[in-house]
Amino acid sequence: MPHNPLIFQKSQKYFSRDELARLPVYRNGPEAEAGWDNLVEQVRALMESGTPPEHEKARELAIRWMTMLVFDTNGDPRLAAKLNHMHENEPSLQAHIGISLALRDYVLRAFSETKMLIYEKYLSPGEIRFMRANYGKRAMEWPQLMADVRDAIDEGITPDSPQGAELARRWLDLFRSYAGDDPGTQLKFRKALENEPDLMIGTWADEALLTFVRQAMSRVVQLN
């Protein structure tokens, strides 16, 4: 049970008892809560000082933030998606914990920058411009999609099933939103993912999830 009564109250609305038992952030003690409070204050200070999210310090804090968030959601994108939903829909909680939507978006932009800097090593100037114009626009859709893939895996749904194909199409749609439709460009992004383990830091995309998606997408491509 969290030490904070408001967090306890709000969590009951969005999570089942089983989910709360699997949610480390719900069981955080004073030391972990203090760690979050300190990180939030550092990020807020940067944002309020006008430091752009692309700045090195902002990127460092964003990586810490997302790494802690993955840990505190037990690496489960379903818990992350619900936590996002709770945060977005509870203004009193935002105010209480000091994480406004603007602060969250600042972190997401800084975190996106850490990934784009890696991808840039593989892309042409034109591809970089397209990626930078579109990369963060649909970032908040990824946790729910990964949650749906995780549900499919746990339910025994196979990648070559109709449900697997639908998940693959949704994944491809999000991927193309920043990679574009050129197969050559898409191959560059996939090459980066193969070569750059840092692209997976602070995400909920484990190997089982990625294997399912790769197999499902391969099946969709064959059918087309």
Protein language model features and the residues they cover:
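Amphipathic alpha-helical "stalk" segments
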Residues: 1-224
